[in-house]
Design a protein with these regions (language model features):
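The feature primarily captures lumenal catalytic ectodomains
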Residues: 1-234
Length: 234
């Protein structure tokens, strides 16, 4: 998103080095590679704490609309989605892989340090129900970044627990059907993202079965009969 801002005013190829706050995660380096960034130009501010430069170019936040960062984070503008599609969908290679039309996002591979505090306690029942409805369970952490883009771009129905994986909704085709499981205080960032991308969004909102430790923490139990009805109504 910040690169989009830079592209409008400077030639990115003229930049000697790009400083990022973190490049530890696999998808970070993969996305930069797809954007044709040379690994020799990528610096992590965690490793390089003090730098000296003749010219330093810094971007502002790409969508700071108000003085409320919580509100701004939940209202991603359409131009960001359009830019992501423009940059990454064009890199998808035509292949014979048969991507599933219905996917369930399994978060058991989540690298979040609080993932153990946010689980679906009846997930086995959910997976059994979705399997009968021809859903394929997908662990995003097992996939490359471009494979994740392919899965979401080819999907017609997506179900999953609120989490960072839903950022890939940016790559969905219009009218893709979404069901998000979330707690009462999670916010509407995924719903707003789906709306901006013209997706058909639905949610199942649950109270935590145990004491919640924060807005996004606490185990939940999904009402199977409600999920079954929402799936059949799609």
């Amino acid at each position: 998103r910040r690169l989009k801002i830079c592209e409008k005013v400077i030639n990115l190829e003229s930049i000697d080095y790009f400083i990022f706050p973190d490049t530890k995660k696999r998808f970070q380096l993969e996305t930069l590679r797809e954007l044709n960034f040379s690994s020799n130009k990528i610096l992590s501010s965690e490793k390089f704490r003090h730098l000296k430069a003749e010219e330093l170019i810094i971007t502002n936040h790409p969508y700071n609309f108000t003085d409320d960062p919580h509100y701004d984070a939940q209202h991603i503008p359409k131009w960001i989605i359009q830019w992501l599609k423009e940059k990454f969908l064009k890199n998808l290679k035509s292949n014979t892989k048969n991507y599933p039309k219905n996917i369930y996002i399994d978060r058991s591979d989540s690298e979040s340090n609080v993932s153990h505090l946010r689980k679906i306690i009846n997930e086995k029942e959910i997976i059994e129900l979705l399997k009968r409805e021809k859903f394929t369970t997908v662990r995003l952490g097992d996939l490359s970044f471009l494979d994740q883009v392919q899965y979401f771009n080819n999907a017609e129905r997506i179900v999953g627990l609120h989490g960072a994986g839903f950022a890939n909704l940016s790559f969905c085709k219009e009218k893709t059907k979404i069901i998000e499981f979330r707690m009462t205080d999670t916010g509407k960032v995924i719903e707003n993202l789906a709306d901006t991308n013209n997706l058909e969004f639905n949610s199942i909102i649950c109270k935590p079965v145990s004491h919640a430790l924060g807005a996004q923490l606490g185990h939940i139990k999904i009402p199977i009969e409600i999920l079954d009805k929402k799936i059949k109504d799609q």
